[in-house]
Curated annotation (Swiss-Prot):
Signal peptide range: 1-27
Keywords: Repeat, Signal
Region called Disordered, residue ranges: 155-212
Protein name (record): Eggshell protein 1
The species this protein was found in: Schistosoma japonicum
The keyword Signal is assigned to this record: yes
Tissue-by-tissue expression: Detected only in mature female parasites.
Name of the coding gene: ESG-1
The organism's place on the tree of life at top rank: Eukaryota
Keyword Signal: yes
Biased composition (Gly residues): 163-205
Length: 212
């Protein structure tokens, strides 16, 4: 009888270890939304002696997967660095997955919006700001003495507009309180070769935290 109770006790402990009850420390919120797309077509540099341009930044990654503490926060920079301060294209930061591990909190957001492009066909700088819109940077002139603030020949060549932002990703799937919502459309001006589609949201955790 005593040995049977001992075995039953050990079996109960083993089951608890293998299938722990939901708690505040092993609960997910649901994954974050995907990142925005990249920027548009940018000029290589500032000034009338510049031409063409590279592509804008890439879109941010999807939100982290749910799990212990949820999916973690995605890198909100996403593609925001697409297009250099001289209007060059460059490739944006494509991070944003979040960690999804036991040291992360919440479902988190996915990557940010894509960066804007530079000037079309040269002219001013016009790299991206953190909202994916082009701006008139202070390197709008060229090395031949044109106005460095883009007010003479730089402005004549046209200030570049930010590339078209991409679509936000889908929300996280299931778990916890459900997935977070995807980000909205990326902000930015016209420009050719608009950004790509945002990443998918991460998968949610299994349980909703009791304090949520």
């Amino acid at each position: 009888m005593k040995s049977s109770l001992t075995l039953l006790f050990l079996a109960a402990i083993g089951y608890t270890i293998a299938y722990p009850p939901p708690s505040d420390y092993d609960s997910g919120y649901g994954g974050g939304g995907g990142g925005g797309g990249g920027g548009g077509y940018g000029g290589w540099c500032g000034g009338s002696d510049c031409y063409g341009g590279g592509n804008g930044g890439g879109g941010g990654g999807g939100g982290g997967n749910g799990g212990e503490y949820g999916g973690g926060y995605g890198d909100v920079y996403g593609g925001s660095y697409g297009g250099g301060s001289y209007g060059g294209g460059g490739y944006g930061d494509v991070y944003g997955g979040g960690c999804g591990g036991p040291d992360c909190y919440g479902g988190g957001n996915g990557g940010g919006n894509g960066g804007g492009g530079g000037c079309n066909g040269g002219g001013c700088g016009g790299g991206p700001d953190f909202y994916g819109k082009g701006y008139e940077d202070s390197y709008g002139g060229d090395s031949y003495g044109n106005d460095y603030y883009g007010d003479s020949n730089g402005r004549k060549n046209g200030h570049g507009k930010g590339g078209k932002g991409g679509n936000g990703g889908g929300g996280g799937k299931g778990g916890g309180k459900g997935g977070g919502n995807g980000k909205g459309n990326g902000k930015g001006g016209g420009g050719k070769n608009g950004g790509g589609k945002g990443g998918n949201g991460g998968k949610g955790g299994s349980y909703a935290p009791s304090y949520y």
